[in-house]
Amino acid sequence: MVNLYNEEELARIEKIKETNDKLEEFFNNKRAEWTSNVEPLFDVIKNNINLESFSKVVEAQSIALSFRQNINEQISFFLNKRSKEEVKIKKVKQDKFMFYALGVGLKTSLGEKNTLIDAHIAENERNIQLIENYVEFLRSTSKNLEALGFTIKNKKK
């Protein structure tokens, strides 16, 4: 049986897995943080807006705008990270294709090569999926904050 993973490749995959596990925990914590920061803003509009609550409403509107800007910056940052990871994947795919086409001594079809390559890049793809899930969460949170702004605007009328 041919060994398809040398020690260097196993170490590379393990390092990415550890990074992904930390990234997943980081994103879970950030989701919880965003949720706890945003929820109180929605509590402000649960009651009718009157003169007493008006300053809280204006403050909530201001905070929501600030959060949306923060979210947009985070989205850009993580989309850039995703882009860099996609470049890494293309390089690994190329290297592994050459390995399976020329170096391993196995006769494989293109589909079989792709299956073998997919196993090598699974953790890289997990990294991209984690980033995409977090970016989607941020986009959803931003839309909710935008809707909050419209709700406040309509209630003030």
What feature does the model see in each segment?
Residues 61-64, 68, 75, 103, ...:
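Long, heptad-repeat alpha-helical coiled-coil rods/stalks that form the central scaffolding/linker segments
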Residues 5, 13, 26, 54, ...:
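Sequence-level detector for tyrosine residue identity
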Residues 51-58, 83-129:
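Extended, amphipathic alpha-helical coiled-coil scaffold segments used for oligomerization/tethering
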Residues 30-31, 46, 71, 81, ...:
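Prokaryotic Sec-type signal peptides and long signal-anchor helices
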Residues 79, 83-91, 125-157:
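Long amphipathic alpha-helical coiled-coil segments
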Residues 38-72:
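Short, charge-rich amphipathic alpha-helices with coiled-coil/heptad character
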Residues 1-52:
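Extended, charged low-complexity scaffolding/tethering segments
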